[in-house]
Amino acid sequence: IKMLEDLETYVKWVGTPGKAAIEYLNTWVKLMSPITPFIAEELWSLMGGHGYVAKAVIDKELTRGDHLFEVEQRYVDIVTDDIRSVLEVVGGDTVVVYTLDKELAWIAKKVAEEMLSGAEMSDIIRRLSRELTELGIRQPDRVIRTVHEVVSYLGPEKLIKYFETSKEFDEFSVLTKYRGLIVTRLGLKDLVVYRASDPRAPDLGGRKSRALPLKPGIYATSST
């Protein structure tokens, strides 16, 4: 039942099932084999599987895809909630978000590492404040507290694993990928995603400078 729910969630998020869905179904049938061998073999054959499913090896890439998707899903949940909060105050049906450069994602990674080491908030602030100040980031204490809150929701261990697998966390790419889902969830007419560092992107409402690690700057307006 849980696997079916996960598959349905995946389809809802991405719209059109792709390679990941096929790999997921393949793994599902492999897991069924010891419990319902005859049904599993029949399904395996219908899906074009080679040989006997009982001898098939479960792909380790499934685990990789799972934790990547989970972190991205939680991140999109956070951004969706932030957009919803802005809309409740200013209204509108068109939203523009500005993401921080992926090169600064190390800040979130560093906070996650500190959290896993058992460091207290005061220690994390003390260790990172100078680096953030040297980068020209204002109010480093507030930034670190905000990032700490988001990392707590994403799961520091899962976020570290995400970085180990993908080498980076590109908020722009993630939000662009799930843009359609956010539009549907919030009933928007449009959602535009920019990198805050993009000189070609209009700085609506001065929201470029509001972009923080894992917390994009958000501007809402009405299309009418």
Language-model features and meaning:
Residues 1-81, 101:
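Acidic, turn-prone loop/beta-hairpin segments
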Residues 51-224:
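C-terminal low-complexity, glycine/proline- and small-hydrophobic-enriched intrinsically disordered tails
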